[in-house]
Amino acid sequence: MKKTALALFAGAFLANDVSALIYKAEETGTQIDFTGSARLQWRSTANKTSPVNGNTTRNHVNQAVRDNGSRFGFKITQQLGEGFYALGRVEWRFQDLASSQHGFDHLYDRHLYAGFGHKSFGELTYGNMATITDEVKQTDLANTLSLSDGLLPYAARHSIQYTYSGVEGLKVGAFYAGHSQRSSNGLDLSNELKDIWGVGATYKYKIDGKQSIKTGIGFARDRFEQANRPAYDRNAYALGLAYTYDKTTVGVDLERRITKDQTYVGNKRIEKEIRTVALQKLTDDLSVYTMYAYKENKLNAVSGQNDTKRRNNQFMVGSEYYLFSDYLKPMNLKLKAFVEWQSNHIKNFTNGNKSSRVRDNVTVIGARAYW
């Protein structure tokens, strides 16, 4: 007897804007998932800039409640038999291109890809997608003020990617993408991408029932076109490590990126990042966390141009709480609120001399619903 299951789950959040749809046809091996999240934030910023030769300026802004990267999309999986399957995904995201108060004025496709896979042989996909190098960092947090954007590419357009997860705890992959005039957020690049490729691997080892270690390592190289000049290239390296004991997780990321010949042949830019995180789950629903990052961006310019250096010490503390978990979990929904505070202590140098000092403080209160 043929069986076709159709499940529709709905939950209340922001006037019932959130819902989840799952379709599964057992006789055909087809499954369609409606995925996404609604994200809102209220943000307050305070800036103090103190030039060495000039007047100190201060600025304080309280923004209206606005979008914080809301998204929705579909995932499709088709079983082909003998362990093989086909898959596809599309995801749209909102972004603010018109300086509106709400931030919902523009919609673009963040993910759009398809491919084939096998649980023993890996997965091959093509399109606009997150890359394996996005998984290398081990300090990233899923809220707004995470300090771990990182130096490795997190996504690529018109890319082909292969990943393998046939060994327990291990995931390895590689990707390549050719020419693109747009970034992963759909906006035009100031210098068009000539090509990009990268490799990455993560491994999670479970020590016992309470302890585990996860590591990540990756490399990426991209090249960009320049008007009336040769293309310039960037090479990025990253290593991440995280340790979990019961409800406590600590992690560290080390990253470095070198850019050569940007703007002028002979220019060399070196970027370094050291990031740390500590997260403590107080209950199943409540967590507190903190991050620290040291970031350096140094330009060794050709003769006749200024050498520059920027040092940034970043601090962040935050807490998140999942609401109504017992009621929403049966409907495949999650609703959380969070509050975060970030402080940036920046020093700028020109030709070895300090040119300015900047203090940036940001506070965010947010809410997210996942389905």
Predicted feature locations:
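Cleavable N-terminal export/targeting peptides
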Residues: 1-29
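Short coil turns and loop connectors of transmembrane beta-barrels in diderm outer membranes
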Residues: 28-30, 80-82, 120-122, 168, ...
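Transmembrane beta-strands of outer-membrane beta-barrel pores
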Residues: 40-46, 92-96, 128-132, 176-180, ...
